Curated annotation (Swiss-Prot):
Residues 388-420 are annotated as: Disordered. Belongs to the plasmid mobilization pre family. Contains conserved positively charged amino acids probably involved in the binding of the pre protein to the RSA site. DNA binds at residues 44, 114. The interaction of the RSA site and the PRE protein may not only serves a function in plasmid maintenance, but may also contributes to the distribution of small antibiotic resistance plasmids among Gram-positive bacteria. NCBIfam families: MobV (NF041497). The keyword DNA-binding applies. CDD domains: MobM_relaxase (cd17242). Keywords: DNA-binding, Plasmid. This is Plasmid recombination enzyme type 2. One of its GO terms (molecular function) is DNA binding. The keyword DNA-binding applies.
Length: 420
């Protein structure tokens, strides 16, 4: 049986626009190669008929319900995004109509749970390997944005327990996901990252060997090009500035050797030079061949994939650390609440004893006192039930009634002991 998957991600102001680009396919993804753009037209949004501006929609939801005048903090969690999905095998067993019903039932459940007015978007992606829904909840409650209270530890446990249960009731064969799945995803990403690093290291070493071969080959060509050469000199007649003694006005010339733009090398050196030039051409072709090999392409591909996995791994670690921090905060909060509950129970016990003494002093006879006190306890019980019903709370016995029941039980035990 497949697992029901419902993961929550906190989205702050800085990440909202990026979430919009991804969910609505407004920009080509550089990190997700799983997207099949030919199937993007199969995506749809159960909340909106067309693309929206996430910032504007979230602002509308907050402003329409906000009761105070305080501005929203810049680092506040604006959206708690739920990723709703299962594995590929589960969806392959469903026809398109049932796949859509799966997401519609999920949307219906969360709309009722968090309020339809608080759902910013519910985008279903069918253009990736596994269909899934990104459902954005603006965590508004009692006129305030309060993500920590809406999605506290108890609520996250409710999601893990009740979502699979609800979907099973709707006819989908799903079971609850295993605890600690975030850690498992991190370990998987970490393993893939390490595997890629090993492959890249192997390719880098092979490329280093090829580079050494290339350098040695290049040096060889360079040494072959060290050809001894002499300047080519030409004898030319140049004037001396003196005139002939015979007075004919003719200037005296002399012969000098001047360099031309040519050089003279031996026939052997010329042949070596031609060979070196050919070797140089072969070297260039060798480099071109090297750069077009499968190994070079594989190195480039793996380097890119390694960057993507590293980015995903970092994101998972960051999310896991956030969950740990939230968990630690909840632990501290629970300690504080337990302390307060303990104090309140003690106060209720004192009120119970004080009420008991007060009524006892003003009632004649033990039987009459017990009847009056029982009537008082029943009134407290009725008031508690009315309060719970009014505020849609889970029906529970109040602490005053529980204290009374304990006292009655103690009295009965004492009476039984005395009768023995």
């Amino acid at each position: 049986m497949s697992y029901a998957v419902c993961r929550m991600q906190k989205v702050k102001s800085a990440g909202l626009k990026g979430m919009q680009f991804h969910n609505q396919r407004e920009r080509k993804s550089r990190t997700n190669d799983d997207i099949d753009h030919e199937r993007t037209r199969e995506n749809y949004d159960l909340k909106n008929d067309k693309n929206i501006d996430y910032n504007e929609r979230v602002k509308e939801i907050i402003e329409s319900q906000k009761t105070g005048t305080r501005k929203t903090r810049k680092d506040a969690v604006l959206v708690n995004e739920l990723l709703v999905t299962s594995d590929r095998d589960f969806f392959e067993q469903l026809d398109p109509g049932e796949q859509k019903r799966f997401f519609e039932e999920s949307y219906k459940l969360f709309s009722e749970r968090y309020g339809k007015q608080n759902i910013a978007y519910a985008t279903v992606h069918n253009d990736e390997q596994t269909p899934h829904m990104h459902l954005g909840v603006v965590p508004m409650r009692d006129g305030k944005l309060q993500g920590k209270n809406v999605f506290n530890r108890q609520e996250l446990l409710w999601l893990q327990d009740k979502f699979p249960e609800h979907m099973k009731k709707q006819g989908f064969e799903l079971k609850r996901g295993e605890r600690g799945s975030d850690r498992k995803h991190i370990e998987t990403a970490k393993f893939k990252k390490q595997t890629l690093e090993k492959e890249i290291d192997f390719l880098e070493k092979n490329l280093a060997v090829k580079k050494d071969e290339w350098t040695a080959y290049s040096d060889k060509v360079k040494s072959d090009l060290e050809v001894p050469a002499k300047r080519h000199m030409k004898s030319v007649e140049v004037p001396t500035g003196e005139k002939s003694m015979f007075g004919l006005g003719k200037e005296i010339m002399k012969t000098e050797k001047k360099p031309t733009k040519n050089v003279v090398i031996s026939e052997r050196d010329y042949k070596n030079l031609v060979t070196a030039a050919r070797d140089n051409d072969r070297l260039k072709q060798h480099v071109r061949n090297l750069m077009s090999t499968d190994m070079a392409r594989e190195y480039k591909k793996l380097s890119k994939e390694h960057g993507q996995v590293k980015e995903k791994y970092s994101g998972l670690v960051e999310r896991f650390n956030e969950n740990v921090n939230d968990y630690n905060e909840l632990l501290e909060e629970n300690k504080s609440l337990k302390s307060k509950i303990s104090d309140l129970k003690r106060d209720v016990s004192l009120i119970y004893e004080s009420t008991k003494e007060f009524l006892k002093e003003r009632t004649d006879g033990l039987k009459a006192f017990k009847n009056v006190f029982k009537g008082f306890v029943d009134k407290v019980k009725d008031k508690t039930a009315q309060f719970q019903e009014k505020h849609d709370l889970e029906p529970k016995k109040n602490e005053f009634e529980l204290t009374h029941n304990r006292e009655v039980k103690k009295e009965r035990s004492r009476d039984q002991g005395m009768s023995l």
